[in-house]
Amino acid sequence: MARPRRSGKKKEKKNVPVGIAHVKATFNNTIITFTDLKGNVISWATSGASGFKGSRKSTPFAAQVAAETAARKAQDQGMRTVGIFVKGPGSGREAAMRAIGNVGMKVNFIRDITPIPHNGCRPPKRRRV
């Protein structure tokens, strides 16, 4: 039986030549989001959405695959030049930044915006393994 046609609006192709890549590297996952200069999301990808599960999500290779996926989607929308904001202590920071450059995007700047507490909340207790 034929499936009914999907109604609703199709994703329109934007032409955004300059944008910002936000890389959030946590201990468990890496999230890459490409936005325009106003902050509207153009494309995104995560290590988990790229097919990695469990502890493999936190590897540099998973971050590289996610960054390449998000960068290619952003290039399809016309993005050529990008600035990178990096946040978090994860292992995928460097791999994600390198992957964005290797896809063919021109990187304007790299800025670390990891939030640092001025003696705010008490940190979690140390792990004893």
From Swiss-Prot:
GO terms for cellular component: ribonucleoprotein complex; ribosome. PROSITE patterns: RIBOSOMAL_S11. GO terms for molecular function: rRNA binding; structural constituent of ribosome. It comes from the Bacteria. InterPro entries: Ribosomal_uS11, Ribosomal_uS11_bac-type, Ribosomal_uS11_CS, Ribosomal_uS11_sf. Gene3D superfamilies: Ribosomal protein S11. The keyword RNA-binding applies. GO terms for biological process: translation. SUPFAM superfamilies: Translational machinery components. Keywords: Ribonucleoprotein, Ribosomal protein, RNA-binding, rRNA-binding. Located on the platform of the 30S subunit, it bridges several disparate RNA helices of the 16S rRNA. Forms part of the Shine-Dalgarno cleft in the 70S ribosome. Part of the 30S ribosomal subunit. Interacts with proteins S7 and S18. Binds to IF-3. NCBIfam families: PRK05309.1, uS11_bact. Belongs to the universal ribosomal protein uS11 family. This is Small ribosomal subunit protein uS11. It comes from Maridesulfovibrio salexigens (strain ATCC 14822 / DSM 2638 / NCIMB 8403 / VKM B-1763). The gene is rpsK.
